[in-house]
Amino acid sequence: MKTRDEKITVSDGLERLPEPALKSDERKMARQKIYALLEDRDATLTFEEDDPLEQTMVLNMGPQHPATHGVLRVVLKLDGERVVHAVPELGYLHRAMEKLAENKSYHEFMPYTDRLDYMSPYSNNTALCLAVEKLAEIEVPERATYIRTIACELARISSHLLSIGALVMDTGALSVFLWTFQEREKIYDIFDLLTGARFTISHCRVGGIASDLSKECAELIIRWLKQFKPKIQEWRKLLDRNRIFIERLEGVGVISKEDAIAIGLSGPNLRASGVHYDIRRDEPYLAYNDLDFEIPTFENGDSYARYQMRMLEMEESVKIIEQALRKLPKGEVRNEDAKKTFPWKDEIYHSMESLIHDFMMTDSGIQMPKGEIYHAIEAPKGELGFYIQSRGEGVPWRLKIRSPSFCNLQALPKLVEGGMIADVVIIIGSLDPVMGEADK
């Protein structure tokens, strides 16, 4: 056995390995000697200069990798299994959304917003409509405002279900992923009944919504909420007591309150670091000012806190939907100003005036006033904002999208550097990015 002051090289003992012709007993003794050297805690291991273990390695993770949650490429510099440096590379799903908006009327651009955060398309529709309505000073009927609120919270639950299910699957468990997808399918059935489409819905309209909330749809939502609430508690009992799940997330990907603000995090990722900020409460829009709900926050700023945030937000979304259904007012669901909104589709087939009105709106679009506006909402991923610059035409001169996933991914290098390569997958899942929204 080597003394404390003596050094052992990796090649020490290896260079005296027996030749293949040696007996098995001699070969066994040589192996035991090497094992004894490696188990000596007082010995100091040194490596030769050309040893590959002394060199850092660059690893490409993605863009075609199931753990990156989309076409995200992360270039990792590794020292063994520890991440020394990380560079996220975006743009693989870039479709020039902002440039396309400059050649589309505000109504024509609505379906494009569905393809931003395609996990919660209703939130994207709502954000664009609110920005346009704010610039054009269009009043939206109160019933339409409440229906938008209900649909946005359903979209939030749907998005968080996917996020939690995928995160748990990243840790090696598949069951929760299947359970969350079962509930998402039920939400899609609700959207199908409400909007006529399950996924890319384009239900919002400037000045209101495309169709009213039927009694049948409202009853379906109530029945689903009743059976969904206990399931959240079941999942929390299962995951919050699972030692493997907790150890994979707790203390992994920690970011402080100050760093989260400096980088520009928003949504659950920001509140998980202790920042008590939610646009629904701090800058109320839709019907949130009339509803009672809590804004959960955590101080740890790690992956486990981000998971907890989304679990608690689903519970609050259930409360919001229940209140909105109870308070749902009667009345119209769309502004009837002929210069700012489209006519109803069923009127076009029977009225020449409505047909001409629809043709003019399709050809010229809404004649917006000159000016600029920025409006943001609390989307499931964070602050989703639309900046519109108008020259008084039917199309925007400039439309800028503030996507939360793009801003949240800026924190990725800080979160993964110094951690293990196995934790990179967990950290990306806890951030919950959507690349369609990040790349635009």
UniProtKB/Swiss-Prot annotation:
Signal peptide: none
Entries under Gene3D superfamilies matching the protein: Cytochrome-c3 Hydrogenase, chain B
InterPro entries reported in the protein's UniProt record: NADH_Q_OxRdtase_suD, NADH_UbQ_OxRdtase_49kDa_CS, NDH1_su_D/H, NiFe-Hase_large
Keyword match Magnesium: no
UniProt EC number: 7.1.1.-
Subcellular location: Cell inner membrane
SUPFAM superfamilies registered for this protein in UniProt: HydB/Nqo4-like
Disulfide bonds: none
Gene Ontology MF term list: NAD binding; NADH:ubiquinone reductase (non-electrogenic) activity; quinone binding
Protein name: NADH-quinone oxidoreductase subunit D 1
Source species of the chain: Chloroherpeton thalassium (strain ATCC 35110 / GB-78)
